[in-house]
Amino acid sequence: MYPAHLLVLLAVCVSLLGAASIPPQPLNLVQFSYLIQCANHGSRATWHYTDYGCYCGSGGSGTPVDELDRCCQTHDNCYGEAEKKGCYPKMSAYDYYCGGDGPYCRNIRKECQRFVCDCDAIAAKCFARAPYNDANWDIDTETRCQ
């Protein structure tokens, strides 16, 4: 084998190892973002909800700062209930559709998928109804979420 071929083979192997170490985005979180966009008709980008209040985003504690933050707290609690049932809410893929009045779960026979889809659809509709207060985005959770 020629040295150039070995270099190409080595480069391919290294790049494959690097790609394997990148964790995949949990499918459910991608679907949840689509449900949010469906519910609010694209009026607010999904990333606005990732660091809002005390509960929107990763984790959560304290008293929710407003109605939207309560939607996130309820969604977190719903995922907690799903986990108690032995479900993996961040990994449960499901079938849904986007109707004129928001997202709906459809054709779901597996209990975990149905439960998680309902959690997400209810939360997405709650997000769409709740006012968004820019002052509650990226807050200091150490002081405001006690």
UniProtKB/Swiss-Prot annotation:
One of its GO terms (molecular function) is calcium-dependent phospholipase A2 activity. SUPFAM superfamilies: Phospholipase A2, PLA2. Its EC number is 3.1.1.4. Its main location: secreted. Keywords: Calcium, Disulfide bond, Hemostasis impairing toxin, Hydrolase, Lipid degradation, Lipid metabolism, Metal-binding, Platelet aggregation inhibiting toxin, Secreted, Signal, Toxin. Its cofactor is Ca(2+). It is found in: Secreted. Residues 20-27 form a propeptide. The keyword Methyltransferase does not apply. Gene3D superfamilies: Phospholipase A2 domain. Binds 1 Ca(2+) ion. Ca(2+) binds at Y55, G57, G59, D76. It comes from the Eukaryota. The active site is at H75, D120. Residues 1-19 form the signal peptide. It holds the Pfam family Phospholip_A2_1. It is an enzyme of class 3 (hydrolase). GO terms for cellular component: extracellular region. Belongs to the phospholipase A2 family. Group I subfamily. D49 sub-subfamily. Snake venom phospholipase A2 (PLA2) that inhibits collagen-induced platelet aggregation. PLA2 catalyzes the calcium-dependent hydrolysis of the 2-acyl groups in 3-sn-phosphoglycerides. This is Acidic phospholipase A2 S8-51. It comes from Austrelaps superbus (Lowland copperhead snake). The lineage of its organism: Eukaryota, Metazoa, Chordata, Craniata, Vertebrata.
